[in-house]
Amino acid sequence: MNGKCERCGADVTKKNLRQWMLRITKYADRLLNDLDKLDWPEKVKKMQTDWIGKSYGAEVDFPVEGKDEKITVYTTRPDTLFGVTFMVIAPEHPLIDKYADKITNMDAIKAYRTECQKKTEFERTQLVKDKTGVKIEGLMGINPMNGKKIPIFIADYVMMGYGTGAIMAVPAHDQRDYDFAKAFGIDIIQVIKGGDISKEAYTGDGEMINSEFLNGFTNKKDSIARMVEEIKKMGVGEAGVQFKMKDWAFNRQRYWGEPIPLVHCPSCGVVAVPYEELPLELPDVKNFEPGEDGESPLAKIDSYVNCKCPKCGGDAKRETDTMPQWAGSSWYFLRYIDPNNDKAFADRKKICLLYTSPSPRD
């Protein structure tokens, strides 16, 4: 809460750690399409559809002035490109560290980053909150459609783990961008006719204006298609698809959890523990508190960590992170359908029947 641990009151900060991920995004289309095969309530299927969050749009490259560099953004509204008057990147964006020696207000950038590390993702992305951010002095973006220079900001509401970690801002037609532009005195250029942008952003449909070859278009779908055609011809972008669903971070820095059966070898890389050596069991220890370095408690147990590579026989180290609680809760209950089996965890046929038969006892 407010950057403090709710239990002990200590400062809470975020650290970047190497993660093991389950690539569930590979199955995004299948998960989405097969919802039609399920006899579920429509409101539940709607929740699943929104969670998967498939969207169609475009990836657009914004050059960085004077640098052999570009910032790529994903947008569902490429038709509003002529209305882009600034960009926002996540505080964690690698562009900042890459050009730290060119940025003249790095102290302010670092201070803002520190504050962001104290916030949860929910706190950072709330719509109803004061708009905060820092302009990156020393770097400017260029709108690829009109060649105009546009400022680049960092702000907490842009997350590195979502999209490309950067957004193009069209304040005339997005309320959050509008509020940000008002707070920082940034130009607001209307490209869709309607509303009163002196009071608020216009988020409805209408005739395209101030957009050169799109002027006069009234159909949003046609406007988007025409813009995608143009950015592709210019070599600054192409049509794209994105999902809200993210890959599953499948590791935790704690003692109590299923060990991840992988070995890190300096010669062979990451090697799986042989099947015949499974299950890999946790060592019996008295102190299982995590260290201040963020490493798993298992990392401090030399007798567990140090091992031989299953592939080359050389010195190696075990993976010390453990699986999340979902790993155990997703399968332990299957033992109940075959509790007396002393040859396997559960008979595969019975497991199949559990999912395919009206009654597993049949």
Residue ranges of model-derived segments:
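Residue patterns forming the tRNA-binding/recognition surfaces of aminoacyl-tRNA synthetases
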Residues: 1-71, 78, 166-282, 293-299
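Amphipathic alpha-helical
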Residues: 25, 30-53, 95-132, 290-298
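Residue-level detector of beta-strand face positions
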Residues: 59-63, 138-142, 262, 306-308
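Conserved phosphate/anionic-ligand binding catalytic regions in large, soluble enzymes, centered on
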Residues: 72-92, 322-333, 361
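Catalytic alpha/beta core of large soluble enzyme barrels
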Residues: 93, 97-196
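Active-site-adjacent "gating/activation" loops or surface patches in catalytic cores
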Residues: 144-154, 321-354
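Acidic, glycine-rich two-metal-ion catalytic cores of nucleic acid-processing enzymes
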Residues: 289-330
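Conserved small/polar residues in nucleotide/adenosyl-binding loops
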Residues: 355-362
